[in-house]
């Protein structure tokens, strides 16, 4: 079915980071993972030729399909303009104002994985089922101390529960990407730890993971300009030694939040 659509419209892929999922088994498993109901409005980013769109529309109340490539937008209109429950939005998903939606299910363009994920996580929705490059997906769910534990892990953990649903081999796509992929399930929820100031916490995580191999004391001192703290030495001198002598990659999200909160409180006192 998918190959026939690609042939009919002379779609080659490769433009706009396009890799079309052509394996029907994986398409069906993605839809099943979304646990759709007839009441759900589903957002799909990078709808492509509509092979996932079509399956989503069978189970959901409405599908909002976002696509950047004008050629593919034309394909989507040709295939689905008669469908009452599919809305097609032509545009860049990073710039489009998303309508309200309940769930997001997408084979994401890999080049915008980080940006689009955190744009999504700032929206209210029930569940996400999203395709990423495999290594990116692993970084989203890695425990502290692992080589893949990163800023991405912390940021994801702050906004949502994340788990790998399945690994998808590169041969399931046309054209095949260079690496395997994985499907992540995201369930947004309130932060599992206290953060005094969300913006500062996320800046702090970005700063210390930019020097992840250094002890936290040095990582903080070396990134004071990023954190906009002129009196950083005075503040660091008041932070617990057991944290300062560890690397950022060895601290749990809760511990990093604790350090960020202490710095924020001390900074607010204007030493």
From Swiss-Prot:
Gene Ontology MF term list: RNA binding; rRNA (adenine-N6,N6-)-dimethyltransferase activity
PROSITE patterns per UniProt: RRNA_A_DIMETH, SAM_RNA_A_N6_MT
Any Gene Ontology CC annotation: cytoplasm
Chief location category: cytoplasm
Residues bound to S-adenosyl-L-methionine: 19, 21, 46, 67, 92, 107
Highest taxon of source: Archaea
NCBIfam families attached to this UniProt entry: ksgA (TIGR00755)
Protein name (database record): Probable ribosomal RNA small subunit methyltransferase A
Native species: Methanosarcina mazei (strain ATCC BAA-159 / DSM 3647 / Goe1 / Go1 / JCM 11833 / OCM 88)
Organism lineage: Archaea, Methanobacteriati, Methanobacteriota, Stenosarchaea group, Methanomicrobia
Gene: rsmA
């Amino acid at each position: 079915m998918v190959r026939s659509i690609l042939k009919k419209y002379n779609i080659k892929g490769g433009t706009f980071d396009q890799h079309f999922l052509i394996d029907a088994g994986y398409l069906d498993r993605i839809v099943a993972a979304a646990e759709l109901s007839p009441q759900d409005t589903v957002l799909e980013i990078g709808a492509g030729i509509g092979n996932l769109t079509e399956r989503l529309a069978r189970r959901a109340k409405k599908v909002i399909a976002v696509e950047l490539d004008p050629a593919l937008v034309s394909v989507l209109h040709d295939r689905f303009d008669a469908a009452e429950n599919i809305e097609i939005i032509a545009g860049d998903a990073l710039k489009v104002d998303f309508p309200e939606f309940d769930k997001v299910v997408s084979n994401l363009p890999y080049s915008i994985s980080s940006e689009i994920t955190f744009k999504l996580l700032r929206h209210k929705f029930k569940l996400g089922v999203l395709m990423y490059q495999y290594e990116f997906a692993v970084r989203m769910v890695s425990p502290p101390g692992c080589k893949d534990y990163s800023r991405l892990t912390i940021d994801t953990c702050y906004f949502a529960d994340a788990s790998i649903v399945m690994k998808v081999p590169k041969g399931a796509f046309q054209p095949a990407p260079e690496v395997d992929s994985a499907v992540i399930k995201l369930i947004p929820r309130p932060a599992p730890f206290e953060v005094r100031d969300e913006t500062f916490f996320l800046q702090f995580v970005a700063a210390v993971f930019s020097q992840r191999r250094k002890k936290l004391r040095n990582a903080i001192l070396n990134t004071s300009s990023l954190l906009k703290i002129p009196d950083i030495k005075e503040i660091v001198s008041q932070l617990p030694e057991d944290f300062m002598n560890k690397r950022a990659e060895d601290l749990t999200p809760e511990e990093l939040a604790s350090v960020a909160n202490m710095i924020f409180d001390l900074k607010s006192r204007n030493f």
